[in-house]
Amino acid sequence: GLPEVVVMDEHGVMNDNSGDFRGLDRYEARQRVVAALADAGYLEKTEAYTVPVGQCHRCHTPIEPYLSWQWFVKMAPLAAPAIEAARKGQVKFYPARYKKVYLNWLENIRDWCISRQLWWGHRIPVWYRDGETAVSVEAPAGDGWRQDEDVLDTWFSSWLWPFAILGWPEETDDLKRYHPNSLMVTGADIIFFWVARMVMAGLEFRGAVPFQHVYFTSILRDAQGRKMSKSLGNSPDPIEMMERYGADAVRFSLIYLTPTGQDLLFDEKRLETGR
């Protein structure tokens, strides 16, 4: 196939593969490339149009496609037993409609990129030395070994949670007593990130589903239906709400107004109902 050519570095600056545009910021480089095409007579036309651009969820910086080496887990063999477990009723979902959501994701699953280029996290347990590669939590014997600089996706440790917290891989008394469990209570927004992966991990590493029942709670959203978050600043202070309306009124309002199996769109005015 065609050679894989990377034209910018990790900071969005054009690299040595960019010729005359080397050292330019990506935004300036775009303008220079267009101008160069026009000067050479290769620019047929320009037109305005709208295109979706991915953004970092933290800083909202536009994301650039970037070729790099990453670690992946082949997921299809892991998904097959998890699909069968749901179809046979070994794992049941409440509300029941989430079974379809769970199955649809697993039946169309893609390989999982588990490596991240972050300064914090669980280090990937792979070591390199002079063309050698070793997989080990601890550094191999001898000098000169260098650990992989990437860390694992946070969900990679989370999918092991049902049995890792009980002492696994050791066969501890807690592991024998509490795994598998009966009930998992969580939010439906992480059914893919966590629930499905925990089922896959349990079947792969323990030979059993980690829980038989999954209950999805409602999610408290703002009046516009957005998930509450620090970055949006749309989450009310519960202490202030309780001081204003009373703790019992807040509790009753949330319980009474939340529709069964659906998310609640929160408006402070609705706390008057509870009071």
List where the protein language model places each region:
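Residue patterns forming the tRNA-binding/recognition surfaces of aminoacyl-tRNA synthetases
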Residues: 1-131, 226, 232-233, 237-275
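Alpha-helical recognition segments enriched in aromatics with Gly/Pro capping
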Residues: 1, 5-11, 117-262
